[in-house]
Amino acid sequence: MKIGCVVLAAGNARRFGSNKLQVQVDGESLIRRALETVPSGLVTVVVSQYPEILSLAGEYGFEAVWNDQPDLGLSRSVRLGLEQLTDCGGVLFLVADQPWLKRDSVEALAALWAQHPAKIAAMAHGGVRGNPCLFPARFYPELLALNGDRGGSAVIRNHE
């Protein structure tokens, strides 16, 4: 089954004060670290309002999707990314500001999901569910209907 990936990289970083995805962690920008976690073989789109991030996405062979209205919140990026991947049986959502996330962890999540493709799979840390998460196609209508600063966690809560 074909799996797509949406890298969410359009946030305004209001509390941070600048584009935090360009901050260096161990000599590498947050965005580059995020793009390195994408498992090979996934159809991947990167959603951002930042031209430099969209350019970097192209260097990785990923599709760059311009978010021209980031103030509409996370739901706008979810929608823009998912609209490019509706032919996939599942879509993995990665947020770009998790510097310690490793590709092997994301690959393990995708492998787990492949064993139970009708269910949502999400990473957890310390017993708290978070990102990344992988949704089967049956949840696409709900994800596309999100609004404001709501993401996949709202859909997950609807199905607990």
Predicted regions mapped to residue ranges:
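Catalytic-core segments of class I nucleotidyltransferases/pyrophosphorylases
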Residues: 125-160
